[in-house]
């Protein structure tokens, strides 16, 4: 892994960009890495565009700035790509993962990005298993498969710790299942 691995998640309020960023950071922390995770909001209402940042490093992180040149961008809501330049600053060798059924070539045209681009229908996965549009966990599964930035087992552990007291065993099991489906189904 490079010195600092940076991830930017774009979504809409209520889709889990903030919690996805936190879950990823906590999984990295479990592995002994230094982390930062923080959101940036526009108007704070459900459905408003949001962005969340995660920084993961083997050494102490001293600056607390937005991620301008990410190694990976996750887009939880395909529709925001029409109004937000989600690939802005994305490293040339970075990856773009989008929650959509649209093929990578069409995503690249819309995003203005020619680098590695992947899609996963994370909304359908979350609707099928949880009956809610919270695509963050399947998107994290895709990110882990494509980058290895954290181990799948680390994120499973964080999901258990985070959600068991709040949601119970059944929803934890479904979140872990969504993580694995995201890992298995991401496509180029």
Task: List where the protein language model places each region.
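Active-site cofactor/cluster-binding pocket
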Residues: 1-188
């Amino acid at each position: 892994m490079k010195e600092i691995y940076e991830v930017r998640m774009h979504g809409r309020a209520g889709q889990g960009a903030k919690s996805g960023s936190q879950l990823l950071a906590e999984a990295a922390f479990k592995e002994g890495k230094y982390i930062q995770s923080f959101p940036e909001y526009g108007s704070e209402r459900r459905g408003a565009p949001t962005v969340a940042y995660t920084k993961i490093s083997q050494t102490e992180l001293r600056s607390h700035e937005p991620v301008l040149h990410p190694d990976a961008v996750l887009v939880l809501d395909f529709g925001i790509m029409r109004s937000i330049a989600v690939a802005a600053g994305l490293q040339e060798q970075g990856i773009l993962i989008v929650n959509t059924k649209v093929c990578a070539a069409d995503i690249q045209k819309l995003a203005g990005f020619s680098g590695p681009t992947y899609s996963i229908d994370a909304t359908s996965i979350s609707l099928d298993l949880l009956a809610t549009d919270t695509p963050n966990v399947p998107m994290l599964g895709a990110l882990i498969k494509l980058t290895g930035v954290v181990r799948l087992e680390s994120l499973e552990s964080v999901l258990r710790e985070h959600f068991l007291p709040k949601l119970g065993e059944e929803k934890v099991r479904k979140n872990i299942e969504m993580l694995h489906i995201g890992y298995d189904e991401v496509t180029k």
